[in-house]
Each structure stands twice: as C-alpha cells, then as structure tokens.
C-alpha cells in the first residue's frame, strides 16, 4: 500500500520515510495509466477531427464532444509533466538518484511544481466532460436550444488553457515570493470568468423553457448549484492572506469535493440517466431516480459543507485522529452521517440499474424528444451504429428533422432501419493493444519485484521492454482494414 498519500509529496515519498514497495507500485502504476490515457486521447482526437458525419462542422458538434476533445488535448500536455515527476521519483527509490533529497542538493518543492502543473489541469480534465454532458442534457429537458452555444464552447477552451496558469495557488505557503504569489492570485481570479460564462448560459437555457424535471434534469440542475458553491470557495484561494489559513485544511477538502462530487459526479449521473435508455433500450425508474437524487443531494451537503467550518477552525487535512479539545467532534460526526446517507443513495442507484436492466420499461429510440443524432437510431444501437451516415443540417440535427416534418404535416421519421451487419464496413479487431499492455505489465513487474539477484530481476524488465517495442511497432504498422477489404 503506498504510504505517501495520493499526492506523494517529497521527501515523504522517498525511501527513508516510505520503505515498503507501495510507492513503487503507485508511481509505476500511474505511468502505465498515463500510457493508456495518452493512447486513448490520441484516438479521440483523431476520431473527432477526421471522422465526423457529413455537415458536422466543429461549431455543430455537441458540447459534450467538444469538451471531450479539449480534455484529450489537455491530457496530451499534462501527462508528460507528471511522467517526468514519476520517473524522477522512481529513479530516486530504485537507483539512488537524489532529485528530491534536500541534503544532497535536491529540491522537494520541485515535486510540488511537477505534481500541481499536472494536478490542476487534471481538475479541469475531470470537470469539463460533465460540463459537456449537462450542456447536452439541459436543452433536451428545457425543450429549447442551448443558449449561447459558441460562448459555452469557447469558455470551455478558455478554462482548459487557463488551467495551466493557476497551479501555484496550492503552494502559497511554500515561500514562492510576492511576485509569483501575485501572478497566481490574478490567474486564480480570472479563471472564474469563463466558468461564470458557462453558468449564466446554462441558466439562460433554462429561462423560459418548458422544463421537464426528469432524473437526468435534476442531476444537471444539482450540478449547477453545487458547482457554484465549489467555484466560489475556489476563488477564495486567490486571496493569498486568507489562503494561509485555508491551506492544507479541511476547507480545501470541502472545496475539492463540491467541485468533483457536487460537480463531476452529479454531471456523470445526469449523463447515465440520460443515455442509459439509449445504451440498454430500457428506462431507469424515475421514482427511484428522483429518490436517488434527493438523498444524494442531502448526503453530499451533510458530508462536505461542515468541512468548510472545520477547515476555518484549523482542522488540517491528512490526519486520522485529533484531540477532543479542538471542538471538531460534532461537525465530524455530522459529516460522517452524511457519508452514510451518500452510501444509501448509491445502493438505491445500483438497485435501480439492476432492476431496470432486467425488467425496466422499454425506452424506444427517442424517449426524451432529444435533439442529438444518437436518438435517430434504435435503442440499444446496432453494432454499426448508423446504417447510413446522417447528413447534419445544423445544431440540434434531430430537432431540425422533426420540426420540419411537423411543419410540413408529415410523420416524424422513426429510427434508421436495421440492416445486415455484414453489409456495413466495420473496423477489424486488433490484438496488438492487449499484447502491448501485457508487455508493459511485464516491464513494470521487473522493476517492482524484490529479487536481490540482478541477473533475474533486470532481464524481466529487458524482456518486457523488447516486447513493448515489438507490440508498438506492430500496432503502428497494422493496416486499418484487412487486405480483402481494400
């Protein structure tokens, strides 16, 4: 088990303080995950750039796709930064280098810079996709187009770019100096601007709409409310003098969880309730869904809101016990009770998923009267998705088709008819990705196992490295289709 925390601050993650192998598993495991994220990110970017439907210009793409696109580009630049830090930490632990050892001329603050240069864009990597999801959900249940589409798209891009300029507000207490503190104070305030643009455009989408408060819509609206709380507490970090009081306290825990649970998790739940019918052909129970939402809403506020007060009363993060004289008992008990409430809400969600998948109401191809292309095919979709490539005439393409049919007095088109899958060209499967994954695992095992005999330990890594080379070479030279398909 890694005993340096998820942040692995040096020098606590170095050998003298974390002598078991947990940190090796942590650092090498993260490097493997980084390779996975990089490959998946390239796949998303290439697909979005090259394989859009006819008429699907960039400014007609769903906002969710836009946000996924921005996130993959962020990952492409963020992963190398944390990879450098992980490689240096691994070399310190396995080969005796001294990147983060102060007594030998290393600098533990260097780890904090590398970690947070990656870590703060990572926050936006986590929150931008749910922002895209609710930007697709809100119009469907407000029955009107997304207000300010270009502003929502470009504010998402701005958040991604500005996310690189705020990392050191996590480090105001390490002695950066007044100029650096002033710069990061300003950038931390400025990033609230594109975030506010999104919120006001979401509110504009709801304004005057014929709103249906289905479960997906409740989670989307809950996302907005909780993210506002998390965003406001985040802007307070920009005030360096008060941040000295907040730094590394439960106030930071409260802020982070209002953003990542009240924001990202509620947004993901909204997407699940919205697209589950498309994926499975079954509707989730609205009664259970609304119960799930309200218990989650109560539970997350009971869990995380008291942490603001605990932090401002001096309770530091990363502790497992405290003296009763501090007076933190009651709020911690309330927070723990809130966690139990959250746990109950998750049980309701899991039960809803299982029950609805087995015996839920048939969804049909378009249960929400939604505007997106995915609702023009059957639920669940066939393996080939679209039997014919749709031609996109504008944003909200299915609404355009449906409203034109109504205006002309015609029947609203149903889902695309099913065809024999053998008549549709599909990409061929490849075994090289799994081969490369296993090879990377062998390479990692060679570094992590505790065998004092070097001629047993290191050849495992060498073999793994050679297999990785073979896998990547074969994978990159594999044709996209079999020879018979050309």
Give a label for each model feature.
Residues 1-486:
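Membrane-embedded and interfacial regions of multi-pass energy-transducing membrane proteins
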């Amino acid at each position: 088990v890694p005993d340096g925390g998820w942040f692995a601050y040096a020098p606590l993650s170095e050998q003298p303080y974390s002598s078991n192998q947990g940190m090796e598993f942590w650092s090498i495991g993260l490097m493997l995950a980084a390779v996975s994220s990089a490959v998946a990110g390239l796949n998303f970017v290439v697909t979005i750039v090259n394989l859009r439907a006819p008429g699907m210009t960039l400014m007609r793409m769903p906002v969710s796709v836009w946000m996924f696109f921005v996130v993959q580009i962020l990952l492409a630049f963020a992963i190398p930064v944390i990879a450098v830090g992980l490689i240096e930490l691994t070399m310190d632990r396995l080969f005796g280098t001294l990147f983060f050892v102060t007594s030998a001329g290393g600098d533990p603050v260097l780890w904090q810079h590398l970690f947070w240069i990656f870590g703060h864009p990572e926050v936006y990597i986590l929150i931008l996709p749910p922002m895209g999801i609710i930007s697709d959900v809100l119009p469907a249940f407000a029955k009107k187009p997304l207000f300010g589409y270009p502003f929502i798209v470009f504010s998402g891009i701005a958040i991604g770019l500005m996310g690189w300029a705020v990392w050191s507000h996590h480090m105001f207490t390490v002695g950066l100096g007044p100029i650096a503190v002033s710069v990061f104070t300003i950038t931390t305030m400025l990033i609230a601007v594109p975030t506010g643009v999104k919120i006001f455009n979401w509110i504009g989408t709801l304004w005057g709409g014929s709103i249906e408060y289905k479960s997906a819509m409740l989670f989307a609206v809950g996302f907005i409310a909780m993210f506002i709380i998390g965003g406001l507490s985040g802007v307070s970090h920009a005030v360096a003098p008060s941040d000295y009081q907040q730094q590394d306290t439960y106030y930071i825990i409260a802020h982070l969880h209002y953003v990542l649970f009240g924001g990202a998790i509620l947004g993901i739940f909204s997407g699940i309730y919205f697209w589950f019918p498309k994926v499975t052909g079954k509707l989730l129970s609205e009664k259970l869904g609304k119960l799930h939402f309200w218990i989650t809403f109560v539970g997350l506020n009971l869990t995380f809101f008291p942490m603001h007060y605990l932090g401002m009363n001096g309770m530091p993060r990363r502790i497992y016990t405290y003296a009763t004289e501090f007076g933190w008992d009651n709020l911690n008990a309330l927070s723990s009770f809130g966690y139990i409430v959250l746990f109950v809400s998750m049980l309701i969600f899991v039960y809803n998923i299982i029950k609805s998948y087995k015996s839920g109401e048939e969804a049909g191809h378009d249960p929400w009267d939604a505007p997106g292309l995915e609702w023009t095919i059957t639920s669940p979709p066939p393996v080939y998705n679209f039997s014919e490539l749709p031609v996109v005439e504008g944003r909200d393409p299915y609404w355009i088709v449906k409203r034109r049919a109504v205006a002309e007095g015609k029947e609203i088109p149903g889902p695309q008819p099913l065809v024999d899958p053998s008549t549709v060209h599909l990409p061929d499967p490849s075994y090289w990705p799994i081969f490369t994954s296993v090879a990377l695992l062998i390479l990692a095992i060679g570094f992590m196992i505790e065998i004092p005999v070097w001629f047993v330990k290191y050849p495992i890594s060498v073999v793994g490295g050679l297999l990785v080379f073979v896998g990547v070479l074969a994978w990159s030279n594999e044709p996209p289709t079999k020879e018979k398909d050309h």
